[in-house]
Amino acid sequence: MHRRATPAMLVTVLLLAVLAGCSTGAPARRTPAAPAAPEPTAVATPQVAAGHAPVNPYPVGVRNLKLNRTGRALPVKIWYPAAGEIGDPARSGAAAAKGRFPVVMFSHGLGGRPDDYATLLTRWAAAGFVVAAPTFPHTSRGADNNVLDVLNQPADVSYALDQVLALDAKADDQLQGRLDADRVAAAGHSAGGVTTIGLFTANRDERLDAGVVFAGTALGVGTAFAGTAAPQLFVHGQLDKVVEYAAGKAAYDKVPWPKAMLSLPKGDHGQTMLKDKAALRVVSDTSIDFLRWSLYGDAAAKQRIPTGATRGDIATFDDHL
């Protein structure tokens, strides 16, 4: 169901519109947004039991899933750990590796598509995560660029998560018995970052154990973080002209849970962060270690994060994990 636009929402559209220049199953368990941000909670570890994080990288498989939420077409691209030889390119329809893997839902930015982020998302899958990325009906490349529709996207992600997790019990599916519904994160870039923040605030999905926000802001979704503590990693370029660094930092400052912010002094809205080889390596390694800790309970990964995040003087790291 589409959310009715209120005057407050319409005001945010004027600010969200600057983003338009950027191109780059089971019912969801949600709780209502709190009227104000909750008091900070001193949580030293994620709310996920320690698992067995992969020791070695996996080959990667890719597949597509056709979804539709009450008339909203939501094709989903899935990258997943696959069987085979390391070094092979991502293979369509490859058999999944043995094991049960955490799920990461990724949301693209305005004018973007999941494939724009394939390098990063393939690395996540190789590290032992099933990454599912919807193409949103009104904010993807070639769509009508209805910026207000970003406010409907958190519900799209929750619906897509329902359907992805249902594959775990679907007979003869590639991902049957491969998905760990108790280890789930959301991530997104730009408007996808807004979508991701919304999944922890106004549209809280309690299945989510962690979040990764790239160049995002809380415009339209607020900062009333609600529900069980879920660690958050923010990544933002300090030269971002689309979503200013200060806007991302303001949202980060409101997070009441374990959190960290990776800041790139020479980073822009996405090209440096997601395309530049040196910066991408820092971003991907930091985000992988964050996900290993928050979804697998890998304490060694948490210890690596501060050193890896600041190597090469590419980024600074504010650590409250």
Q: Over which residues does each language-model region extend?
A:
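Alpha/beta-hydrolase active-site loop
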Residues: 116, 147-181, 198
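C-terminal motif of bacterial Sec signal peptides marking the signal peptidase cleavage site
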Residues: 18-21
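Alpha/beta-hydrolase-fold serine-hydrolase catalytic core, especially in secreted/extracellular enzymes
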Residues: 276-321
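Short alpha-helix in the alpha/beta-hydrolase fold that links the catalytic acid
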Residues: 243-253, 276
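Domain-level recognition of soluble alpha/beta enzyme cores
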Residues: 29-105, 116, 123-127
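Short beta-strand/loop motif that positions the catalytic acidic residue
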Residues: 228, 234-236, 240
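Acidic catalytic loop of the alpha/beta-hydrolase fold
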Residues: 239-243, 269-270
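Bacterial signal peptide processing site
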Residues: 23-26
